[in-house]
Amino acid sequence: EHRIKHPIVYIMACRIGPFAGHFYKEIHKLGGIVYLNPDGHEWMRAKWSAPIRKYWKISEQMMVKYCDLAICDSVNIEKYIHECYDGKGIKGRNPKTTFIAYGADLTLSKLADDDEKLVNWYKEKGLTKKDYYLVVGRFVPENSFEVMIREFMKSKSKKDFAIITNVNEKFLSELEDKLHFKSDKRIKFVGTVYDQELLKKIRENAYAYFHGHTVGGTNPSLIEALGSTDLNLLVDVGFNKEVAEDCALYWSRKLGSLAKLIDKADQMSTDEIAEMGRRAKKRVAEEYTWDKICGQYEDAFIK
């Protein structure tokens, strides 16, 4: 329609694998090229049935084959692409890849601690500044909600555990049947928060943040947590460690691991926590600013 010469078509995620070859050829006929962001391991997500997971995996293979460049948002995803698909590209070639992560906003919330919006939210949810652990994320099994709730219940912490998520009632019922968390007044499902300034302030005022994502590449909520919450407790997987490095504490999904870490975190001094926060913010400022990410995209698209 716009007669663009040498267009670059950037496809996000690996949904349309069966059509990838057709579109690749048509775009090349127009003098264009195809870039792909393979996203994370969608085929591993527990929310999908076995046939859908199989489709995602096959679709991923076809889309990696029929692209001119795969832009991976994680070093581990880039490594995975080569381990799985080297020699499986067009004419047996290896896929061409590059790494460009996500960015994060490092500015502090505009809300003060005595802002009426924040005060009312805390009052409604029964929470107090620096007296709650926090998690923000999709309510799906691969984000380790069962482990986080189970381990928090086993911990000796006197603090609350605030869970900001859009609850899936079926999954919630399954967790209650397994864990009986409703008997523990510290576990608080507090709904969703779409006001970004309020959410940012809630992050800043958390005693610590849990990140339990086990599937996918660089997760935006992890970068946001590192940029706003001083103390971060992350599940020990490659995707998380490549982002946070030594700026966070790590736990495994094994029984007792996170509970032990929570008890340790509760005993950390104010200075120790502040130092963790300083390192985390420095890490994000050096590697995950939008200026840096946008510059890398400009290089990929213009050069």
Give residue spans per PLM region.
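Acidic donor-binding loop of glycosyltransferase active sites
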Residues: 201-217, 230-231
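A short, active-site helix/loop in glycosyltransferases that binds the activated sugar's phosphate group
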Residues: 65-96, 104-109, 118, 144, ...
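Glycosyltransferase donor-sugar binding loop
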Residues: 104, 136, 160-175, 188-192
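Conserved acidic donor-binding segment of nucleotide-sugar-dependent glycosyltransferases
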Residues: 248-256, 264-270
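Conserved donor-binding/catalytic core segment of Leloir-type glycosyltransferases
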Residues: 122-143, 149-156, 162
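Membrane-proximal helix-turn-helix segments that form the acceptor-binding/catalytic region
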Residues: 52-70
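A short, well-ordered alpha-helix in the C-terminal region of glycosyltransferases
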Residues: 272-287, 296-299
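An aromatic- and histidine-rich active-site surface loop
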Residues: 4-38, 217
